[in-house]
């Protein structure tokens, strides 16, 4: 008779593997997420590098629009300053600009969003599909959200940057909270001016700022 009380053994590395899979899925934007996932884990089991299709190859294989900062700016303008947006409404906006449904679903899954979505969090994860690294992701988010419309360096309120960096680092799971806190404290005390704004160069060109 088969034993039913045998404890299930969950490998300690599983949570990290699942996070890496979720991030890879956002970046790859596969047309068939299930098949892509099967190929991904099969490659891992053989000790091989998981499959990642180039963005140009993806665009050639489908009629979806390519995700760009410009399209994210359009979505941001349509959200019109709201902090919370309903998933159904955002899905419709996403569809109107012809972005891949699988990418929308991947962002929803990684962010664990339900019926009501915190727009800045969704935007940050969507930008991570373009940014790859945390620094590049935050650069793109700043460009999308920039309150400078006179052709200057993209800039956003430091409070917004603080929220986004903390969230992205938390989702990434590979950066300790103490490092995030240390970087934010340095930027706030040594970099931010009286206007309370942070520019892209403040965290991409400053050798003392390392967000990764």
Swiss-Prot record:
UniProt PTM comment: Sumoylated, sumoylation decreases upon spermatozoa capacitation conditions.
Highest rank taxon of the organism: Eukaryota
Domain RIIa, first and last residues per copy: 12-49
A molecular-function term among this protein's GO annotations: protein heterodimerization activity
Places the protein is found: Cell projection, Cilium, Flagellum
Gene3D superfamilies: cAMP-dependent protein kinase regulatory subunit, dimerization-anchoring domain
Phosphoserine modification, residue list: 56
Region spans: Interaction with RHPN1: 209-212
Primary localisation category: other
GO biological process per UniProt: acrosome reaction; cell-cell adhesion; cilium organization; cytoskeleton-dependent cytokinesis; flagellated sperm motility; fusion of sperm to egg plasma membrane involved in single fertilization; protein localization to cilium; regulation of protein phosphorylation
Gene Ontology CC: cytoplasm; motile cilium
Keywords assigned by UniProt, alphabetized: Cell projection, Cilium, Flagellum, Phosphoprotein, Ubl conjugation
Note: 'Ropporin' comes from the Japanese word 'oppo' which means 'tail'.
Primary role: Important for male fertility. With ROPN1L, involved in fibrous sheath integrity and sperm motility, plays a role in PKA-dependent signaling processes required for spermatozoa capacitation.
Domain comment as written in the entry: The RIIa domain mediates interaction with AKAP3.
The family this protein is said to belong to: Belongs to the ropporin family.
Subunit annotation: Homodimer. Interacts with RHPN1. May interact with SPA17. Interacts with AKAP3. Interacts with FSCB; the interaction increases upon spermatozoa capacitation conditions.
Protein name per Swiss-Prot or TrEMBL: Ropporin-1B
Organism this protein belongs to: Homo sapiens
């Amino acid at each position: 008779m088969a034993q039913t009380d045998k404890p299930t053994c969950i490998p300690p590395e599983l949570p990290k593997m699942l996070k890496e899979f979720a991030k890879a899925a956002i970046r790859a934007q596969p047309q068939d997420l299930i098949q892509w996932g099967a190929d991904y884990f099969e490659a891992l089991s053989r000790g091989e590098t998981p499959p990642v299709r180039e963005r140009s190859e993806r665009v050639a294989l489908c009629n979806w629009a390519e995700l760009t900062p410009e399209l994210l700016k359009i979505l941001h303008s349509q959200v019109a300053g709201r902090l919370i947006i309903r998933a159904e409404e955002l899905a419709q906006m996403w569809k109107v600009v012809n972005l891949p449904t699988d990418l929308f679903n991947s962002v929803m899954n990684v962010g664990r969003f339900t019926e009501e979505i915190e727009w800045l969090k969704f935007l940050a994860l969507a930008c991570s599909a373009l940014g790859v690294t945390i620094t590049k992701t935050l650069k793109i988010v700043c460009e999308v959200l920039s309150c400078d419309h006179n052709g200057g360096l993209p800039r956003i309120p430091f409070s917004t940057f603080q929220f986004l960096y903390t969230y992205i680092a938390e989702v990434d799971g590979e950066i300790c909270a103490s490092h995030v806190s240390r970087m934010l404290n340095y930027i706030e005390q040594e970099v931010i001016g009286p206007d309370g704004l942070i520019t892209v160069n403040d965290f991409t060109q400053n050798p003392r700022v390392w967000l990764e």
